[in-house]
Amino acid sequence: LYHGPRNDLPRDYAPKEVIALLNERKNDIYCVRGNCDTEVDQMVLEFPVLSDYCVLAEGTQAIYATHGHIYNEQKLPPLHSGDILLHGHTHVPKCVVHETEQYICMNPGSVSIPKEESWHGYMIWEGKNFVWKDFDGQEHTVFRIENDSVRRRS
């Protein structure tokens, strides 16, 4: 909900509206704490937001979700072959398959402060698909988990 002291105030900044939108979807959201999130955010949100990480399962793969300021591509959490590291922090959407280390790194981008000329958007996980969308619902990129690897869907 907070943009941090190093970032300009986002255009159309409306944290109370965001709170209402998020709370409406509280049963659909898995959340991890970002480096600007605090106990004040937890007081107004109706789902947990202060966990440093969460581990989700997709078949035999683990999806290690974290903000990215502690664990990231340069400092990996414990991963097994084929696991997915899902982190933000850079505010730049991406999906990279690291063949040598045998893991996949994904970044959902940023809803409020996208960087490096990326779009205001988000990523959703539906079944075996990871979909990056903008606020108009346009799909920018879709990746699908197949046989413990990730493939770009055409």
What residues fall within each predicted segment?
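Non-catalytic terminal accessory segments
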Residues: 26, 145-154
